[in-house]
Amino acid sequence: MTKYFFSSSFLLFLGNWIGQIGLNWFVLTTYHNAVYLGIVNFCRLVPILLLSVWAGAIADKYDKGRLLRITISSSFLVTAILCVLTYSFTAIPISVIIIYATLRGILSAVETPLRQAILPDLSDKISTTQAVSFHSFIINICRSIGPAIAGVILAVYHAPTTFLAQAICYFIAVLLCLPLHFKVTKIPEDASRYMPLKVIIDYFKLHMEGRQIFITSLLIMATGFSYTTLLPVLTNKVFPGKSEIFGIAMTMCAIGGIIATLVLPKVLKYIGMVNMYYLSSFLFGIALLGVVFHNIVIMFICITLIGLFSQWARTTNRVYFQNNVKDYERGKVLSIIMMDRGMIPLGSLLMSICADVFGIVRTFSIMGISTICITMVFYFINRKLKLKLEESNHGIS
């Protein structure tokens, strides 16, 4: 079952990247309006924030394999319709693109927590850490090759062909999902009465350590993870006129992420999960500071480390919550945890304003320092709470 799930995931994520690049290019070249591009991407992302909790509740109630087939089949259907429309008509209304982006956003909002909830149940032969790490590895591989494939398609053919490639990826992904079946987790009667939001509030009341990790993640997603938006500005400032530097930098970042997912399961045998999360977040902040040096070798090394440590932080975050949640609450809790990604666009906006006011080099320094400070503050808060809990338990015993 593992091979079918990960093969399907690879094709789904590959299709997502090819389609995303193709859609952005289609909107820009067809309508020549940057506002339309912003609206389309807003419609694609906002359902994730609005529907994730509801989607997580669904993942806890029904056969996850069937839900996965439904979501990917629906993605194939709407993408195939868009493909037919763009091939059939020389111009289509922007409203059609907005409707498509919204539908894909809704399906993504359901599929993301669902996929995370499946990982611990894949196989007895691999641990949750290995499953999450390999899942992240696939995401990073697709992030590396997806845009490149889309670029080749756009150069040789045109944007509608990227939608065709996307639909083909989805279709094969659906076929690979056919053997996937998972037992529905039995929800206790007293737990089934509670609304999803109450379950999440009660979870964070009980798990103080998890609460600190989640808050840390929300903040550093805004301060540090917006680097992808600002990196082209930095490379153009430090190395003006050398556009290839940005492409190489993004490749190095992806390589760092791939290395991180491969070695993390081994590293976690020697370093505790929580300590690993805070350590990788701290080193991520240090790496952000390193990219401001006007030295191409140092920049590429630091970019690689950014990819490595940021992926370590994200993966240990996901693994921690996978290992510290009840089976029948996994979908609900993970749906909230995955919403930390919603802080990246907000952080990008804030850091873009900082770049206009203070300059791009100082902005990266601000990003690095703020990420380091946030990590250290919440690490010591978490440590203090842990010591208090140990003292109280010792007093009781």
From Swiss-Prot:
SUPFAM superfamilies: MFS general substrate transporter. Belongs to the major facilitator superfamily. GO terms for molecular function: efflux transmembrane transporter activity. It holds the Pfam family MFS_3. It comes from the Bacteria. It is a multi-pass membrane protein. Involved in staphyloferrin A secretion. This is Staphyloferrin A transporter. Its main location: membrane. The chain crosses the membrane at residues 10-30, 39-59, 67-87, 93-110, 137-157, 162-182, 213-233, 245-265, 271-292, 296-313, 333-353, 358-378. Keywords: Cell membrane, Membrane, Transmembrane, Transmembrane helix, Transport. It comes from Staphylococcus aureus (strain NCTC 8325 / PS 47). GO terms for biological process: response to antibiotic. Disruption phenotype: Deletion of the gene impacts growth in iron-depleted media. Mutant accumulates staphyloferrin A in the cytoplasm. Does not affect staphyloferrin B levels. The keyword Transmembrane applies. GO terms for cellular component: plasma membrane. It is found in: Cell membrane.
